């Protein structure tokens, strides 16, 4: 999308350059000099400084105090007239500086130095200015069209880039948030299910073991019950161990796969960012070099006419230099690509090696654990067999009776039946629970899939709507520019160029030498500044790169130290656990060996108790070790996630710094203006075409190589993963087969042993029947003792289990609380980052708005000064011509010329009004589009940071529309009253002398500018003036309601040197046709239009508030009787004395305007506060909804606090809404009052 927009902008720019290529052939100097000063492009310093950009744009175009414009009119010939003019200039300059200081603050030393250099250049170019004024009008038209088109392209590119970056950032944030949430949910569900399964399994096993132990100790003898119990424990522990190993292997495999996938995606994203940044930087470097080269060719065109050979040699050298630079940049980029490829290969090798070492270490650990487990099983089996043989031998020696044999057989049959039914009941309960949980799991997956699909569809629809809206706006802007601006500019240029072609040929010889010297000086200054700017930019790049490398190195060093410390602690802990376990085993074995040497009959119970305690200790140690391993794995995962989050945050900050730097570089590079010449058009097209073909081919090659490398990496990774999976599955299969074979062999061996033992027991039981009566009492006593010991141990074991459950519940609650706190902290950080980014964006837009305002103001002021100078020269020429014509005398011709002059002046006024109206429509359209994009984009209110009370934007049209729309009232359409204007000085000359009509027609063909308020005439106390002549002494009738006091004091704001488009009126003759308008015509008025102009301001405010929607009545005198205090643009040539004026009405109107401004600012701040409160309430509601989905026991207090805050915010929203509703009617009155003031001014 971005490449398409860039190509479209370049094509439109080429079309624009083709249209104006004839105008730029011999007017090179008019692009760089204006009023004797060098017109330098706006630097990044002026764009970034919001306080002093507009003030210096105004000061740069002010005339110097040492060179006053010499008006040779009737009033400036005497000493009194010169003193009066000097006093007017001093007072205007004083008020200008006061206004600049109040609006923009104090001036910085760097800006003062810049202003001092400009003043020096003005003094140097004073003599040259007098000869160069003829080219100004053509320069103005060219620059206006060029600037309009360039600002339009800049705005379009800036908005496109901004929306693209915002969309990319939102998509990236959403993807990251979704991935993190999905991973957390999966891990949480797996962890919860595993904990539930382990707890349930443990409780079941404990209940089963306790029941069986109690039953067997009551019924069977000690040795038989012990052997059966240990056999069941071995089987259960083996099954649990196998299931735990399988679950651990699966979890490790899933975790390794997810980590590898995240690293792969992260590397690919970083690589794409680096490649795009390098391409963008190279593109701008090449564009800057080509623009500088074109400007150099344009500057050297005039000098090349005298010395063509030297110019060709210079072009050859410049081409070689830029070709070498381009070749070096290309080689540097190739080396950078090679370096990136090497780094990527090394990274892939390191990742594969790390994965292989981890896998190898894991396999070794598994093998060691299996070997240890087999050794423990063999030792346990041997000990069990030994004890079983000894118990059978004692049983054979002591059992002789047939009744005991029958009772034992009956009891054994009951135990087997009970065990079988217990197993069946347990399996049925487990199957039932699994069936109940299966639909819930399927429903959860279906809900997640449907929600994700709906969200994707909504995002896609929003993206398509935004794209269509952008395309529509771009098409409208292109059509408007092609239909209106280009034909008007081309027609005006073609008409004026024919008239001035002859004068250009005559003046070119005189200005050639001076122009060459000035070109040399300007080129040397430009070269020095460019070199210094390049050095500064390289220093900034080196500093940024050094800071990024230092930060990465520190983070890597800290992570490496922490990982080494954790690894060392884990190794020490494992060694300590192994040593402790080995010591426990050794002690138990010693105790058993020592106790076996005593009497067998007396110590059999103690030996069995010690062995049972040893088995319990081993089982407890084994369970504790497994839980410790699980907790360490969880802690390791958390630490790895924290490290990854820290790395992402560091990279995000580096990316933000790089983006800001790129923005600054782009803002600097945008200010360089490209000028195309007719001589090198074919050569430049060929070079651009070849460069474009080469770059497209290289881009295609880079894309293909990148796709091939990514495909190769993916295939290698997939192959390695498949092989690893196959190897793991084969090993697991072999291990399962071995376990099954061992289990079957053990079953067969146990059956044979049981059969032999039972046969021997059957034989020996006959012999032991006689000893039953003797041993019956001893057996009963021994059973009682064993029962008491079993009950005591069961109680202690039950207490331990309860304690473990409580600890586990507390750990889960603490983990959930920590997770909720971390999520809430991350959400607050993201919210603060978004608000800071929005504030920075609004601040940048305000900076750009003030810079644009300064440029428009500077251009308008220069145009006004030039028009005054031209009028003075025309006045002098007309006076000289009048002296010649008075000697000849022709009264009849003068009368005939007077009648002809009236009709021509009427036509001239109509053309002038049409030209001014088209100019105002173009400027108003640009201002409206800019204000809608900056202040009212999509109807969304801006944040509070965008309200700057100390700034005043002079584009009043969109602001009034926005305030009226916010207050609930429609836009008020106003019409300009047409009033007749006097003939003026030029009209009187044309009425007396018919030969001056041609000069008068050429003079009046130009458009009249507007006068800023700091060039207005001061009050009556400073300079008394005489009443005007030639029919201007008619009394002005009183006007009703709002317009009468304003028009009564109109000379305070509209003085002879402030020509407004609304002041043009129609003389007796054909009426001016009204201009068609589709909406309210909002003019771009200067600051002088809002100066106080009436004495009855409070009365007008009250009347306006009473009737806010009524249009102010327009007096009929404005359309019939000329205003004695308004002057025409032709009266600018002579400074005539006017009637005396008072400042009381000005002060009242100023107070009224300040009050209106305060009301509007208060309404805007209230609206912004309401928007921020609504946003805060929505965020609090969303947090409550998320918290209610997963409630916790400790979150109730936090939820109550958030609920109270939400209620307070809703109350505040209600109060602000009521306040806005109450303020709508006063705001509508203020809007109507401003419309009435503007209508009266027009």
Swiss-Prot record:
Q: Which segments carry the region annotation Interaction with CETN2? A: 111-130, 475-494, 641-660
Protein's cellular compartments: Cytoplasm, Cytoskeleton, Microtubule organizing center, Centrosome, Centriole
List the keywords (alphabetical).
Cytoplasm, Cytoskeleton, Repeat
Annotated Gene Ontology cellular components are:
centriole; cytosol
Q: What is its main location?
A: cytoplasm
Give the start-end ranges of region Disordered. Answer: 1017-1038, 1053-1081, 1101-1122
HAT repeat windows: 138-170, 172-201, 270-302, 334-368, 399-431, 1148-1180
At the top level of its lineage, which domain of life is listed?
A: Eukaryota
Q: Which GO terms describe its molecular function?
A: phosphatase binding
Spell out the subunit comment: Interacts with CETN2 (via C-terminus).
Q: What does this protein do?
A: Plays a role in the dynamic structure of centrosome-associated contractile fibers via its interaction with CETN2.
Q: Which PANTHER family match?
A: PROTEIN SFI1 HOMOLOG, SFI1 SPINDLE BODY DOMAIN-CONTAINING PROTEIN-RELATED
Note what the entry says on domains. Answer: CETN2-binding regions contains a conserved Trp residue in their C-terminal ends, which seems critical for interaction with CETN2.
Family membership, please give it: Belongs to the SFI1 family.
Query: Which protein is depicted?
Result: Protein SFI1 homolog
Q: Which organism is it from?
A: Homo sapiens
Lineage runs:
Eukaryota, Metazoa, Chordata, Craniata, Vertebrata
